[in-house]
């Protein structure tokens, strides 16, 4: 038997969120049933894929560097087809009714308006003189400012709605 996919799911914070990853070869096709799907955002590390909802017309093509929101698909079965070797990291709620906002951090000074989480998706960005690695995460607090250097990495910021 040939294994052509690797995936992982890790609960990260007192029933708040989890990080998942999917690493597959070109041509891989997978279906995520609605009852198993808690992903709200995905960051694509490499490759590209078709991402669609089963039994609905159309699909999105997501590719390396894309930050893809799937809130509108949270209560649907979805399908992924890898158009090339493909890897993505996902941010998951652990309670479907709990909504989160998410975005990629691009600024040098992060001014936080709500308590939230920073997650390293790729590379080795620096937050407050601390170098991070992929999957590192930590809390940020309302009213605080954080010095950020993302020239060597990608950070996501997530806050509860």
Each model region followed by its residue ranges:
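Glycine- and acidic-residue-biased ligand/ion/polar-headgroup-sensing regions
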Residues: 37-55, 113-128
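A short hydrophobic beta-strand segment most commonly corresponding to one strand
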Residues: 77-100, 152-161
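A short glycine-rich, His/Asp/Glu-containing loop-to-beta-strand
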Residues: 1-37, 85-115
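Conserved hydrophobic/aromatic beta-strand scaffold that supports enzyme active sites
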Residues: 19-23, 41, 59-61, 67-69, ...
């Amino acid at each position: 038997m040939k294994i052509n996919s690797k995936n992982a799911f890790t609960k990260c914070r007192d029933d708040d969120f989890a990080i998942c990853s999917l690493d597959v070869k070109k041509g891989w096709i997978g279906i995520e049933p609605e009852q198993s799907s808690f992903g709200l955002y995905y960051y694509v590390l490499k490759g590209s894929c078709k991402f669609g909802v089963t039994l609905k017309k159309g699909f999105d093509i997501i590719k390396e560097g894309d930050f893809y929101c799937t809130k509108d698909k949270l209560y649907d079965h979805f399908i992924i087809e890898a158009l090339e070797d493909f890897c993505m990291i996902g941010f998951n709620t652990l309670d479907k009714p709990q909504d989160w906002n998410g975005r990629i951090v691009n600024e040098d000074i992060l001014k936080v308006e709500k308590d939230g989480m920073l997650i390293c998706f790729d590379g080795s960005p620096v937050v407050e003189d601390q170098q991070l690695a992929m999957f590192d995460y930590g809390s940020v607090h309302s009213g605080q400012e954080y010095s950020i250097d993302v020239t060597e990495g990608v950070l996501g910021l997530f806050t509860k709605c």
